[in-house]
Every structure is written in C-alpha cells, then in structure tokens.
C-alpha cells in the first residue's frame, strides 16, 4: 500500500467516524426533524409501471451500498486473480479464521437473545468494517508490518463474501421470480460481453449492471447482490490499469471512502436519546451485539490463528507474535457500517434500531480502542 493510499485510508476513517458522530449530534438537536426527512422524503426512479419509489434512507442503503459492494467485488476479483487469494496456501487459514469470526459472535448473540422477535439479528455482530479497520491500521503506521495488514485485509475479504451470502440468503423478505430472471439475463449479458465478445468499454457494464440492479431491487433480493455479481462480470487484465475492472476500482475508491461510506454512516448511525434510558445498554439485543463484536470476534479469529500457528499450519503467522495476532483479532471486531447495515435489514422497530446502533457503536469502539492499545503500546517488537 503506497503512502497516498495510507493517507486516504486514514482520512477516510476519520471522516467516517466524524459522520457517525455528526449524525448522533444532529438527531439529538433542534435539527432532528430535518434528520428524520431521510425516512419521509420519497424519490421515484423509472417510467410508467417500472418504477422504484423509496425514501432517501432506502436509496442510500439500496443504491449507494450496491456501489460499495460493486467496489468490494472488484477488490475480491483482483485478489483472486493476481493477489493474495491467488495462492491456495494464503487462503485456508484466513478463510477459517473469518468463518470462526463470523460463527462465534453469532453464537454469543443467540446465547443471550432467546426472544423470537430479535433472533433475526444474529448476523449483526458477525461483520467487520474494513474501512474503519484500515483507518486504524494507517494510524498505527509502521507498528503494523505490511504482511500483518495483508492478513487483516484477507480476513476482511472473506468476511465480506460471507456478509454478501448472509444478506442474500437470510434477509430476502419477498421474491419476484420474473424480476429475478430479468436481472439474471442482464448478468448473463455481461458475461457474454466479457467472455465471448471481449468488450472492454466500462460504460457497457455500467449500463447492464444498472439494469441488473434495478431488476434485483424489484425482485426482493437485496441490491448489494447485484453490485457484487456485476463486479465479477467486469473484465480484468493484469498490469493494465485501463482494463474496465482496474479503471472502475481506482475510480470508485475515493468515492467510497470520502462519500458513500460517510453518507451511509450519517444516515444510519443517528441514535436518538429521546425517551431512552441507561437501561437500554443492558437489554439482551444490545449486550448480544456488544459481546459478539468485542468478545466473539477476537475469540473466534485469534483462536484459529494461534492454534494454526502453534501447529505450524500457518506459515505466514510464524513471523508474527501472538500479541500481534491478538491485536488484529481485536480490530476485526469493528463492525460499524456493515453491522449497522445488517441491522437495518433485520429490523424496522425504532426502539430495536436504537438498541442495535448503541450496541454496534459500543462494541466497535471497544474493539478499536483495545486493538489500537495492544498494537501501539503492548507489542514490543512490531517488525
């Protein structure tokens, strides 16, 4: 990662944090009525019977986040073809660690929450916010070696793949087979353009991807799946920055970290303290998310990394101390935007959403704070 990219990740992380803090301030000020307009102002897109009519909040969650998952898909495709995921030896341990980091928080959440009304939130503490995590890694600088950062990114990539699968499978509330079939046809059209006609114009994939996204929303499947699958259909050529995948990834990167994620954070992190008592911190759903992110994530990921290192099944891990592995395991508990995203898909009750937001913020802050402390002050020989 070059110096400019490190600066972008650091600045992006600070903007993301500031956007979330601003949302909380605005929603607990005289401007709260304007903040509420995110859910009351509707915007229509389409013609005649082919119309999507959603409020601003849904456009952010269904539209902007689809672009974010398009970017994630482009990153994953590059890593599979020429990056760390191109070597099987680099895949196994991070993949298992990511799975453990998904399973353990979910189990902790379910062990605390037995009410059928809140069980649907089991996936909320399973996510990792790679943007925030990279921001803290950038803040740590040389205290975190390049290979250790690469390990964090690889775990986060598998975490993102799991999140996409979870959203598609568990948070699809209704299904229109006609719209889904039409969306699939647009995906197939992109594959044909890429593999058969060898079309390298980015605009072709943008247009076809837009129609795939439109049909996916109409089908009831969450639009993020369209963003991800579109990315996998876009041509990638090694060492060619002008290939559509490389061009789109580079073009989207600043928009993702400086606009899309901060806007999402502002729209979804606005906890309203009106009518909320301190006891909300001790409600099962809040505790399940806090302990899932702060305890479950570190326990699941670190246990796999440490055991595999001890058994010499993890060659990359031999160059790291257990404290370093523990530090990055803590950082993976920063769920923030991804956890909030799953939360708004799982519930629409205002009280539950406030409990979710508090749980996500507290769990993420604890994970980020202690992860930073371990890697900055406790690890004695970072190199």
UniProtKB/Swiss-Prot annotation:
PANTHER family membership: NA(+)_H(+) ANTIPORTER NHAA, SODIUM ION/PROTON ANTIPORTER NHAA-RELATED
Transmembrane parts of this sequence: 10-30, 56-76, 91-111, 121-141, 150-170, 174-194, 206-226, 254-274, 289-308, 327-347, 355-375
HAMAP family: NhaA
Protein's UniProt name: Na(+)/H(+) antiporter NhaA
Job description of the protein: Na(+)/H(+) antiporter that extrudes sodium in exchange for external protons.
Key words, A-Z: Antiport, Cell inner membrane, Cell membrane, Ion transport, Membrane, Sodium, Sodium transport, Transmembrane, Transmembrane helix, Transport
Reaction equations catalysed: Na(+)(in) + 2 H(+)(out) = Na(+)(out) + 2 H(+)(in)
Source organism phylogeny: Bacteria, Pseudomonadati, Pseudomonadota, Gammaproteobacteria, Thiotrichales
Disulfide bridge partners, by residue number: none
Annotated Gene Ontology cellular component terms: plasma membrane
The UniProt record lists the keyword Transmembrane: yes
Gene3D superfamilies cross-referenced by the UniProt entry: Na+/H+ antiporter like domain
Species per Swiss-Prot/TrEMBL record: Francisella tularensis subsp. mediasiatica (strain FSC147)
Subcellular localization, as worded in the UniProt entry: Cell inner membrane
């Amino acid at each position: 990662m070059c110096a400019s990219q490190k600066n972008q990740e650091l600045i992006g992380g600070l903007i993301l944090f500031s956007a979330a803090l601003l949302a909380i301030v605005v929603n607990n000020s005289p401007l709260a009525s304007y903040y509420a307009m995110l859910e009351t102002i509707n915007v229509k897109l389409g013609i005649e019977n082919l119309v999507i009519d959603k409020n601003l909040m849904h456009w952010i969650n269904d539209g902007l986040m689809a672009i974010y998952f398009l970017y994630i898909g482009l990153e994953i495709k590059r890593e599979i073809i020429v990056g760390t995921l191109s070597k099987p030896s680099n895949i196994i341990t991070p993949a298992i660690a990511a799975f453990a980091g998904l399973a353990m928080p979910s189990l902790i959440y379910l062990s605390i929450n037995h009410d059928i009304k809140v069980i649907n939130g089991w996936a909320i503490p399973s996510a990792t916010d790679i943007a925030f995590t990279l921001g803290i890694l950038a803040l740590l600088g040389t205290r975190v070696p390049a290979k250790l950062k690469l390990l964090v990114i690889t775990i986060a990539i598998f975490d993102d793949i799991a999140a996409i699968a979870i959203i598609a499978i568990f948070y699809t509330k209704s299904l229109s087979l006609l719209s889904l079939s039409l969306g699939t046809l647009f995906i197939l059209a992109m594959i044909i353009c890429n593999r058969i006609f060898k079309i390298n114009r980015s605009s072709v994939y943008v247009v076809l991807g837009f129609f795939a996204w439109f049909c996916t929303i109409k089908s009831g499947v969450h639009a993020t799946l369209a963003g991800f699958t579109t990315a996998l259909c876009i041509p990638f050529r090694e060492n060619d920055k002008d290939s559509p995948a490389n061009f789109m990834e580079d073009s989207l990167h600043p928009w993702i970290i400086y606009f899309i994620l901060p806007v999402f954070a502002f729209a979804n992190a606005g906890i309203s303290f009106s009518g909320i008592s301190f006891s909300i911190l001790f409600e099962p759903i809040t505790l399940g998310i806090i302990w899932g992110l702060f305890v479950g994530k570190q326990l699941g990921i670190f246990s796999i990394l440490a055991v595999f290192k001890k058994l010499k099944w993890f060659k990359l891990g031999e160059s790291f101390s257990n404290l370093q592995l523990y530090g990055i395991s803590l950082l993976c508990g920063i769920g923030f935007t991804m956890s909030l995203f799953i939360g708004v898909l799982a519930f629409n009750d205002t009280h539950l959403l406030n409990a979710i937001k508090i749980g996500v913020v507290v769990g993420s802050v604890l994970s980020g704070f202690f992860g930073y402390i371990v890697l900055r002050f406790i690890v004695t020989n970072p190199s």
